Each structure stands twice: as C-alpha cells, then as structure tokens.
Amino acid sequence: MTAAYLPSILVPLVGLIFPALGMALLFIYIERETIA
C-alpha cells in the first residue's frame, strides 16, 4: 500500500513547506506595509 509511505512524505512536506510559506507571506505583508 502507498498509504504506508504517506506519513514519511507528508511530515517533511508540512514541516518545511508551511513554515516557508508562512514566513514568505509574512515578509511580503511587512514589506507591503512599510512601502505603503
């Protein structure tokens, strides 16, 4: 079953992509506020 391999792929994905996305959105928000 491919379901056995799902956590080993999903955990790093969530652990790396979500913080990076959150930091990127926060950075864009701060930059947009300081320029405006």
Curated annotation (Swiss-Prot):
Compartments, as annotated in UniProt: Plastid, Chloroplast thylakoid membrane
GO cellular component: chloroplast thylakoid membrane; photosystem I
Stretches that traverse the bilayer: 10-30
Pfam family, one: PSI_8
Keywords: Chloroplast, Membrane, Photosynthesis, Photosystem I, Plastid, Thylakoid, Transmembrane, Transmembrane helix
An annotated GO BP: photosynthesis
UniProt KW Chloroplast keyword: yes
HAMAP family: PSI_PsaI
InterPro entries (UniProt xref): PSI_PsaI, PSI_PsaI_sf
Protein name (database record): Photosystem I reaction center subunit VIII
Entry membrane topology: Single-pass membrane protein
